[in-house]
Swiss-Prot record:
Cofactor(s) essential for the protein: Mg(2+)
NCBIfam families on file: dut, PRK00601.1
Keyword Ribosomal protein (UniProt): no
UniProt keyword annotations, A-Z: Hydrolase, Magnesium, Metal-binding, Nucleotide metabolism
Keyword Magnesium carried by entry: yes
Catalytic activity from the UniProt record: dUTP + H2O = dUMP + diphosphate + H(+)
A Gene Ontology molecular function term of the record: dUTP diphosphatase activity
Membership in a protein family: Belongs to the dUTPase family.
Gene Ontology biological-process annotations: dUMP biosynthetic process; dUTP catabolic process
Pathway stated in the Swiss-Prot or TrEMBL entry: Pyrimidine metabolism; dUMP biosynthesis; dUMP from dCTP (dUTP route): step 2/2
The name this protein goes by in its record: Deoxyuridine 5'-triphosphate nucleotidohydrolase
Organism superkingdom: Bacteria
Pfam families, per database record: dUTPase
Length: 143
């Protein structure tokens, strides 16, 4: 399987796996941006991609940024559809107490390539009953 990548900024760093067997490809900032506490910013990566057929790219936060600085992704995971050809950008938010400077070349997120399936939609009058029923939002308890 191949991920085709086009640099649209000469300073862009191509995504790569940090270690053999890693699920996520590191994504890098191509700009310097200050994110103030409780502020959200759309960070450019300087790349466009062509995903393999029948896949999506899931953009996920980096645990180290979240733990150390409260920096995470606002919509996580973000979905990149197979047909999207625009620049990959990452919607970040600062949940920390201090401003955080995203530097050029900094690892800002990771992208996991996953297979997808589309389903046929069938409208019905009734759904099959289950033991769970309509229980949701805490209905299974915490212990």
């Amino acid at each position: 399987m191949e991920l085709l990548v086009k640099r649209i900024n000469k300073e862009a760093i191509l995504p790569f796996y940090a270690h053999e067997g890693d699920a996520g490809l590191d994504l890098f900032s191509v700009e310097e941006v200050l994110i103030k506490p409780m502020e959200r910013k759309l960070i450019a990566t300087g790349i466009k991609i062509q995903l393999p057929p029948n896949t999506e790219g899931q953009v996920r936060p980096r645990s180290g940024l979240a733990l150390a600085h409260g920096i995470t992704l606002l919509n996580s995971p973000g979905t990149i559809d197979e047909g999207y050809r625009g620049e990959i950008k990452v919607l970040m938010i600062n949940l920390g107490q201090e401003g955080f400077l995203i530097k050029k070349g900094m690892k800002i997120a990771q992208m996991v390539i996953k297979p997808i399936e589309q389903v046929l939609i069938k409208e019905v009058v009734e759904l099959k009953d289950t033991e769970r029923g309509e229980g949701g939002f805490g209905s299974t308890g915490t212990m």
